[in-house]
Amino acid sequence: MEKINSNSKVDIAAFIYARSDSVRLPRKVFLPLGNESIIEVVLRRAKACLVDKVVLLTSDRAIDDELVEKAIKLNYEIIRGDSKDLIARTLNAIEVIKPKQFVRINADSPFFEPRLLNFILEKNLNYDVITNLLNRTFPYGVAVEVINCNYYKAMAGVAMENEKEHVTQHIYRTINNA
């Protein structure tokens, strides 16, 4: 865990899930997109959303140290955790940051749309999960996920071992089976 200042009240946090390695395209979050790296674009776009705090969630592996250094340099908070258990990393972030809801944003999705997310957040809807990923009609990379933290904590126990590498797969499995 690094650079956390949780003195201020946080209703909605944007959790940016990032790692430096990728099987298909290693270090893709550092690739340029215009005048910035992809991770810089994602962090900037997240900051434009109606959230109280933007936090980078990454692994505790040395390969992600450069990513952490970049986020610190840009003045973002960081939560580090197990590279294979994103549910545990998310639960840790919820415990440290203490938001009521969190927005999930993937660091390799520079085209996620802040206006779409803000449209949802402006409604101030009190649901367990708000998403456009079920019965997908939006293009890939334009995902919206807003999750109630109490619901997420309650649902963490239903995750199967193979779902721990994913932030919300266990939730969608239970929704689809309902």
Go through each PLM region and give its residues.
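Catalytic alpha-helical scaffold of carbohydrate-active enzymes acting on polysaccharides/glycoconjugates
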Residues: L31, N35-I38
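Hydrophobic targeting segments
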Residues: D11-I16, I39, K53-L56
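Short phosphate-binding loop-to-helix
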Residues: R61-K123
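Short aromatic/basic micro-patch
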Residues: R24, P32, F111, V146
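A short, N-terminal amphipathic alpha-helix
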Residues: I38-V54, E69, K73-L74
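N-terminal nucleotide-binding beta1-loop-alpha1 segment
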Residues: M1-L25
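Conserved core of the sugar-phosphate nucleotidyltransferase
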Residues: F112-A178
